[in-house]
């Protein structure tokens, strides 16, 4: 053990520093606020409150995550992977912590573990502490802001590194026996079975890499039966692990809202190539492999070629299947990870050739291309992540209102926890509390922009959006188009973006002239929402509001846009003012 830490101790120090950098904004914010800190943590990343809301939902006992933010459909089958929220909810309960506090602590733990596991993978591949340590730390620094996002990729990528590590062990073991092969396959199955219920962009990547690596290994060694026997120790446990998923899927398909929801997830029929940036990057990685792979260990070549080809397959599988995965840009972090492993392979081979006086022009080309790609990825990703790393603006002296103002909402959280029934529904407007209610209380929102990610009909989502915007003036076609993601999620944006890609390809190849401009939201949907606006305005606020479950109305009285609403709400006989906390008015809806 002493020898181990003597050889690899530095990576623990570097992992500690990376974890500290990522958790630092939270520590700094809490310390800067001092006695003014009331338990409301700042957010440093997109989608942070989405994941915190999922964890809070599991914390409150709704383990299926049927609908995280709405009062309806709580017992619906899950469309999102529930395992990570359940794990973090468990730890929050065990240590009696709030969900944001739990995840703030995890801002250190997961990146710390991630750097170590990525180092384990790279050291296993190239047996160089310098190469493994450098690229492990560099990868996290390039995504320093992104790795502060809870669950994905912060937590899920831990299993990504482990999955790739087991794949490498399967193909690289020089004294492989059936017993060892079975052991590594079983280890991979355990990792795969866990991440299968955490993040699809990780398990699909693991599956693609393993399938290609195994294919290449069988073709090279001509030992198909041997490796197929080992594969059984992967396939059988995975099949067992998938049983709950299959049972849940049967419930999903049987749900009357399935078709609307399926289309909102962006699974559309399109055979045109997309994700062009991802593919361009990984194709450049293929070129680097080609330039430096002469004389390399054939199993290393199998592994890195599998990474590169898996990257192409994951992004362009729709050319064959026609199915485009919703949010395909989420594979970008995967592509960059594959690139960094290829870069490590490049450096290890160039160093090997340098020591043996075998450097060639191809090696120099590989290094130049790698440098160009590093600069590009930093400019495209790392630079944005550093800007997003809020410690920089937190460190500026002077006004810290951005940190202090949310603390005023702690009284609101305390009031709801003490006075509202569990799973109450809050109609919130004028105070931008969509993030607060689902994260810090056990209550739900009347409308939330993420409701489209759960089983619900388009009709219900449109109705709730219209009622939520009852007091919004001048709702027109442009306003609805700009709100399309809030209403229908990815139903139209994915099709719109893919049509734009297709039109660019057709125009570039001059295959088709006079290509009509892509339409974001079809006219019939615009007209339908406008009709609902008129319908609910004529119905009146009380009847419109009570179309769906609602218990409270929350209004921030100092919002200029809603300055006259406080007086108006006081006039409604079905509303009773029950709290006034820092100008946040809470009205109880009388049935």
Summary of predicted features, one role per range:
Residues 166-193, 228-229:
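Short hydrophobic alpha-helices at membrane interfaces in multi-pass membrane enzymes
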Residues 55, 370-457:
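Extracytoplasmic
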Residues 1-32, 182, 368:
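Start-transfer (signal-anchor) and selected internal transmembrane alpha helices
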Residues 204-205, 324-355:
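Hydrophobic/aromatic-rich transmembrane helices and adjacent perimembrane loops
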